Amino acid sequence: MNKLIAIAIVSLPLLTHFSAQADASEQLKVKLAEIDNLKANFSQTVTDINDKVIQTGEGVFALAQPNQFYWHLTAPDESLIVADGTDVWIYNPFNEEVSVMDVNQAISASPIALLVHDDAKTWAQYQVTNTDQCFAISPIDKDAGVSEVEVCFNETTLTEMVLKDQQGNTSSFLLSEQTTLDKSEKNLFKFVVPEDVDIDDQRLKSPN
C-alpha cells in the first residue's frame, strides 16, 4: 500500500481530445501553478470495496516545484516517502529497508505526479474532469495501479486527495494546517540513508 501511495503521490496529467476535459485540465493547471510549495498535516482513512475502514493514520505532507515531495506517515506505523527532484525514496523503519526509483518512473506510473510535474507529455497520459472544486484524474492506461486520483481545493488551498486502486480500495487524505515552507524546511526533500538498512535500488540504469 505504501509503495502504491508513493508512486501515486508523485504524479497528476491532462487530455485535450475533448473540450470539457481540456477545460478541466487547464483549470487544474492554474490551481497547481498557484502552489509553489506547501506543507500540511494529513489524516488518512483507507476503505475497502465495501466501504469498510481497514486503516487510519496521520502524518506530515510537503511538496515543492519541481518534482519534490515529502510524505511522512507517523501513525499507526511509521513510513517515509521523499522525492528529491531526481529520485524517489521509500523508507520503512520497521523493516529497516529503503527502496529507490527514478522520479520519472513514479511520474509515468500514477496520476498524482501532476502536483509537482508540469509537463505536457506527462499530462497527456491522463484524463481530467471536475466537479465544483474537485478534479478527478484517471490514467488512460487501464493497467496502472491507481485507477483514479481526486484532488479538492478550497479556493486556492489544497484540502483533500483521494486515491482509488484497481482492487477497489480508497485512500482519503484530509489536509490541515497548510503553510508555505521556510528555508530550513527545504531540507525535508533531502533523504539521507540511515545506517544498517537494506537498499532496493530500482532505478533504471543507463547503458554504458
Swiss-Prot record:
Q: Record's superkingdom?
A: Bacteria
Cellular compartments annotated: Periplasm
Q: Which InterPro entries match?
A: LolA/LolB/LppX, OM_lipoprot_carrier_LolA-like, OM_lipoprot_carrier_LolA_Pbac
The family database entries (CDD domains) matched by this protein are listed as: LolA
Give the transmembrane ranges: none
Kindly indicate whether the keyword Protein transport belongs to this entry. yes
Task: Please give the GO cellular component terms listed in this UniProt entry.
Answer: outer membrane-bounded periplasmic space
What Gene3D superfamilies does the annotation carry?
Lipoprotein localisation LolA/LolB/LppX
Q: Mostly located where? A: periplasm
Alphabetically sorted, this entry's keywords are: Chaperone, Periplasm, Protein transport, Signal, Transport
What are its GO biological-process terms?
lipoprotein localization to outer membrane; lipoprotein transport
- Assembly state and interactors? Monomer.
Which family, according to UniProt?
Belongs to the LolA family.
The protein's role, per its UniProt record: Participates in the translocation of lipoproteins from the inner membrane to the outer membrane. Only forms a complex with a lipoprotein if the residue after the N-terminal Cys is not an aspartate (The Asp acts as a targeting signal to indicate that the lipoprotein should stay in the inner membrane).
- The name this protein goes by in its record: Outer-membrane lipoprotein carrier protein
Originating organism = Shewanella piezotolerans (strain WP3 / JCM 13877)
